[in-house]
């Protein structure tokens, strides 16, 4: 392995161990008996005391100093940010930008389960970071800087509301309603929620491809493929969280395997079609790794705990652990509450939308021309086990979503004409 002599001045390599600070602490879950039996493994073979050692670069070791949170949880957050960064942007040429991306992911992880600590409408200073400074460290001098800064602030706005008491506000109610409006609108909102196009742009920045940017149509296809693949694999994880933002809460769930297969086919075809464009390797790598392999390689997921399987139906134990933020997950349980705080919503739309909402989001939120047969609520979250937390759409809408899913190859060719020949190969 190699030694990073300097993480701040670039990479200098020598033939010794990698200098990464690690901590060995958090005891994690023991595999469930039913999983062990289904896998054909005797209980005596199961690892009864799995301990994670959290590895991450020393650049992050002094972050979150002023945050009121257990040290072990901070270490897990740092390791999660490092692992995610390494998985979705495996190649890089610019270490300072790479570290900036890790810090952006750290802020996002906290927003996902401790939203009360993040309020992007209150200013740039949060958890010891200045958001503008961190975003500029990643995107300053790149072709899509302004849009990506808005994209990230939009992510923080909604994500922090979802995991805090602000979830019962008018903003989040309108947001969840808008998710179910149409499949194309869904994928644009899921794109922002997953930081999909944001990470594609970050991959370009971390490889010093400052002048390269994608059209909105190209982003739509790349992110739809990635989100479809990820959500198909994460189906039971999302249900255990009572998630509002999962593709197969709205797409027909019985088409999940078909949707994954089709998206994977289009991705491999795209990989062939774009192979001569070496500058796009990192983009395809992001979609590929985000679409499934991270569920095995990142300790944020339950691959080891569920004895090297993916897609186990969530149990009461898993749901209870999710409520306790095990693996930094977060549970959205339904609350008997009526949406309120309309003033905050109106203030954000009127005064801050150009900074904290991606282009088009205001129009999504303001349009309340909803299907009369779908089940919309005043407040969102899972009402029972094995249930998502968002709008329950009607059978006619599900059929429309299914048709949209099947049109992916045709829409992909319109965005990337190079695909036409590859997809036509019998």
Curated annotation (Swiss-Prot):
Q: What induces it?
A: Expression is induced during the early biotrophic stage of development. Expression is positively regulated by the ABA cluster-specific transcription regulator abl7.
| Enzyme Commission number(s) of this protein | 4.2.3.-
Give one GO term, molecular function aspect.
lyase activity
Q: In which pathway does it act?
A: Hormone biosynthesis
Top-rank taxon, per record: Eukaryota
> What does the UniProt keyword field contain?
Lyase, Virulence
Q: Name the enzyme's class.
A: lyase
Q: What does this protein do?
A: Alpha-ionylideneethane synthase; part of the gene cluster that mediates the biosynthesis of abscisic acid (ABA), a phytohormone that acts antagonistically toward salicylic acid (SA), jasmonic acid (JA) and ethylene (ETH) signaling, to impede plant defense responses. The first step of the pathway catalyzes the reaction from farnesyl diphosphate to alpha-ionylideneethane performed by the alpha-ionylideneethane synthase abl3 via a three-step reaction mechanism involving 2 neutral intermediates, beta-farnesene and allofarnesene.
Which family would the database say this protein is a member of?
A: Belongs to the alpha-ionylideneethane synthase family.
Record-given protein name: Alpha-ionylideneethane synthase abl3
Organism encoding this protein: Leptosphaeria maculans (strain JN3 / isolate v23.1.3 / race Av1-4-5-6-7-8)
């Amino acid at each position: 392995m190699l030694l990073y002599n300097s993480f701040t001045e670039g990479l200098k390599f020598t033939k010794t161990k990698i200098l990464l600070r690690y901590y060995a602490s958090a005891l994690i879950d023991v595999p469930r008996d039913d999983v062990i039996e289904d896998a054909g493994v005797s209980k005596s073979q199961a690892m009864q005391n799995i301990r994670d050692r959290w590895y991450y670069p020393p650049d992050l070791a002094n972050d979150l100093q002023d945050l009121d949170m257990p040290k072990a949880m901070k270490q897990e957050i740092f390791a999660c940010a490092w692992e995610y960064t390494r998985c979705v942007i495996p190649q890089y040429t610019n270490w300072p930008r790479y570290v900036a991306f890790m810090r952006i992911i750290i802020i996002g992880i906290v927003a996902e389960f401790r939203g009360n600590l993040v309020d992007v409408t209150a200013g740039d200073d949060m958890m010891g970071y200045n958001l503008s400074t961190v975003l500029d460290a990643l995107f300053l001098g790149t072709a899509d800087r302004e849009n990506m800064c808005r994209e990230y602030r939009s992510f923080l706005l909604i994500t922090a509301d979802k995991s805090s008491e602000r979830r019962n506000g008018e903003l989040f109610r309108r947001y969840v309603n808008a998710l179910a409006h149409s499949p194309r609108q869904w994928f644009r909102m899921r794109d922002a929620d997953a930081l999909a196009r944001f990470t594609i742009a970050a991959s370009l920045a971390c490889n010093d491809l400052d002048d390269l940017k994608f059209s909105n149509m190209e982003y739509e296809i790349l992110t739809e493929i990635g989100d479809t693949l990820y959500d198909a694999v994460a189906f039971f994880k999302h249900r255990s969280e009572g998630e509002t933002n999962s593709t197969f809460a709205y797409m027909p769930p019985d088409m999940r395997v078909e949707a994954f297969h089709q998206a994977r086919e289009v991705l491999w075809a795209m990989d062939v079609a774009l192979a001569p464009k070496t500058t796009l390797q990192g983009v395809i790598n992001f979609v590929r790794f985000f679409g499934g392999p991270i569920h095995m390689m990142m300790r944020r997921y339950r691959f080891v705990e569920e004895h090297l399987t993916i897609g186990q139906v969530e149990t009461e134990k898993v749901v209870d652990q999710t409520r306790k933020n095990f693996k930094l997950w977060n549970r959205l349980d339904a609350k008997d509450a009526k949406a309120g705080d309309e003033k905050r919503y109106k203030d954000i739309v009127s005064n801050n939308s150009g900074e904290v909402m991606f282009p088009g989001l205001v129009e999504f939120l303001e349009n309340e021309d909803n299907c009369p047969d779908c089940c919309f609520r005043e407040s969102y979250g899972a009402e029972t086990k094995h249930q998502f937390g968002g709008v329950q759409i009607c059978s006619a809408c599900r059929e429309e979503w299914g048709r949209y899913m099947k049109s992916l190859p045709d829409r992909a060719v319109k965005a990337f004409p190079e695909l036409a020949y590859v997809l036509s190969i019998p």
